[in-house]
């Protein structure tokens, strides 16, 4: 039996992350990562010896990409859903990252009890974007995309509790929730330092924001040039090709 067959379960696929030969296990009918995860992994940065945590990690796609892009020695992927955490663990084993990346199948509000208060240098998070309302019939997808098990306020509070003074939080979120994001960050002593607005296509309204916040920092926000994903004809922009290592 090959390593691939031994790690895959029924109804699962092994997908290419298009970076450093990384692969990820996903369920055909469950939650799957999308472009926003790749954008966040490319937007954030860390030093090799930083303690790094990915919250709301899902199948650990951001954690694995960010870990490898920044050559980090030790990291943690936090995911509350058992099946997603299990898939993440098996993806980590497939990519031989088990000595550097650990999965914590836990509520993010309790993670400080495991890792310690103010013990983390860098956090990434691709949180559930949608407030509770009409959700998917698939519980796994609903929890991953809607604020059922957690919400923006709890995520920012937990991040602030985990981060050291001077530690950084990198977040991707819906652009229409930017005001709430900024409010929650500043309320929890996480100063927004860098903002990049993401447009799905030239001529279209933005749909995502990438934000860097720093714990205990002085005020002062840098707004980077817009990130446009697709040209008017629907083709990928050169920058998106570079992010996906296609150029």
Model-identified regions with their sequence ranges:
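Mobile active-site "lid"/loop adjacent to the S-adenosyl-L-methionine
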Residues: 127-154
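Residue-level signal for inorganic ion chemistry
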Residues: 40, 126, 155, 213
């Amino acid at each position: 039996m090959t390593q691939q067959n031994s790690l895959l379960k029924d109804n699962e696929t092994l997908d290419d992350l298009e970076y450093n030969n990384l692969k990820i296990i996903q369920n055909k009918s469950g939650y799957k990562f999308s472009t926003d995860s790749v954008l966040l992994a490319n937007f954030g940065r860390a030093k090799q010896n930083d303690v790094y945590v990915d919250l709301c990690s899902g199948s650990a796609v951001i954690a694995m990409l960010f870990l490898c892009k920044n050559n980090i020695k030790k990291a943690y992927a936090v995911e509350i859903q058992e099946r997603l955490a299990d898939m993440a663990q098996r993806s980590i084993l497939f990519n031989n990252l088990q000595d550097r990346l650990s999965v914590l199948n836990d509520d993010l509000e309790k993670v400080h009890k495991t890792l310690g208060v103010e013990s983390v240098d860098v956090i990434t998070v691709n949180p559930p974007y949608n407030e509770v309302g009409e959700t998917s019939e698939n519980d796994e997808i609903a929890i991953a995309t809607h604020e059922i098990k957690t919400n923006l306020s709890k995520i920012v509070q937990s991040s602030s509790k985990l981060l050291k003074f001077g530690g950084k939080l990198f977040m991707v979120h819906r652009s229409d929730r930017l005001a709430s994001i900024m409010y929650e960050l500043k309320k929890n002593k996480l100063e927004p330092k860098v903002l990049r607005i993401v447009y799905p296509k030239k001529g279209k309204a933005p749909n995502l924001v990438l934000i860097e916040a720093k714990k205990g920092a002085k005020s002062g926000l840098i707004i980077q040039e817009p990130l446009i994903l697709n040209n008017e004809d629907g083709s990928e922009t050169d920058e998106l090709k570079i992010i996906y290592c296609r150029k």
